[in-house]
Amino acid sequence: MNQILLFIGLVIILCLTIKPVGKKLPFPTLLIFIALGMLLGVNGPAHIDFSDFALTETVCSTALLFIMFYGGFNTNIDRAKPVSVPAVLLSTLGVVITAGITGAFAHFVLGFDWIDGLLLGSVVASTDAASVFSVLREHNLSLRGGTDSLLEVESGSNDPVAYMFTAVLATLAAGGDINIPALLAKQIILGAGLGLAIGWAAGRLIERAHATAEGAQTIFLFAVAIVAYALPSYLDGNGFLAVYLAGIVLGASDITGKVEMAHFFDTLTEMAEMTIFFLLGLLVTPARLPQMLLPGLALMAFMLFVSRPIAVGVLLAPFKTNPRQVALVSWAGLRGAASVVFSLFAVVAGVPGGHDLFDLVFVIAVSSIVVQGSLLPAVAKKLDMIDAEGDVRRTFNDYRDEDGMSFVKLKVGAGHPFAGRSLADIGSATDMLVVLVLRDGAHPVLPNGDTVIEEGDLLVMAAPTFEERAEVTLREVTVTPHGRLAGQRLRDVPQGKHPFIVVMLKREGQTIIPDGNTLIYAGDEAVIATLAS
């Protein structure tokens, strides 16, 4: 047990350590975790012989439920509304068309029988939310015409549809006898009904129940995601559909702390993605992959250039979509973790040749991420679909700075240039707006242009928020008695090789905004700004 925990802990630390490095590479970071798993696997230097498909399917399905919940919860519905109809068409009928065409290719060209070919088509029919979100965010790809929102909604909502057809076809391929219309109806009705109901009920409870008091809302939401998946699944409904819809309903609700909850699930989802890709890399046997390389690449290329473009072109035609947008949406149909996890379901269900299906889907998913994921920014630029003025973060609910405004306070001391002047005069000297004047011995003043500022006033001012945070690094240091800051006036502090500015001092419970004459004492807490390297 201790060895297992030690291994898990070391792998998590290693993944988190290499993740920032991966963002500088020309391919999606998620590939690193697959490579790490393969290096530790049976054909790698570590020679870990891990072949428990059932355990992997359980762990990966659990991780996938949180990815799908977060995909719904973090979708900005207001931004997604204009593209919701085409996105839903792509995530439903698009899956059916893609699965059918791909299954036909597998049957006529690769020699699969019809059931196995359609099973393969269903497994790889959905676009992968984890991969799509990762590429969009890593490259901050804001796309014209709401294409980013379209891709996010489609990739977040099409996995449940692909899973549903995978479950049906895997049962048939394993020799099971099922009533297909009844099973599909049960999957959809229970999945959609319970997902919407759980999301609605959780939204009502989250502000009222004692379990959600004082910071426990995130844990409450964590439990809701589990229930939203487990209850429909237990009743033979579509748990993935339910958990996604519950996330959509909660994300659209006006609940306190939504941004903080989204940040928690963002971190949790990153861990889930790393877990899935690492386990899949650990589970695969690289020695078996060469025989699947040619059919896997052929299927990936066929989907990229034939089945996906046909599905996208047919379904977006009624909306008179720009051909460049159709081309980009077609290219952005990345296959990834969800497809490989669904292939595990076929293995566990006892489908003949299930291990070969897993290896084949693994090749398709990895090659899709490598080719489509790596080239997506370049393709978007070539098609002139990048919105240079946009910010893809606005399509997510964890985007906080919606009004672009921050509040600052200013103390008007003796000799301050604002003292004795009206706000009408001051307005021409600053881009900030005085929204409140706090004056000793008087009520707060809501000012107008005729308000005269007096010495001793505390002004609350609104200013545009600084957006380019990535270019500046802020750090807090304690001034030591023998450090280069102690005993120096700010203007006399030597800059050295890396210039910096002391933007704030904390001294004995007080906050000081310094100028060149400010004397720095040992024990001060200094907030220092430097240019990011």
Model-derived regions, located:
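Transmembrane helical cores of multi-pass secondary ion antiporters/exchangers
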Residues: 1-389, 402
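Cytosolic regulatory regions of ion transport systems
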Residues: 310, 317-324, 328, 338, ...
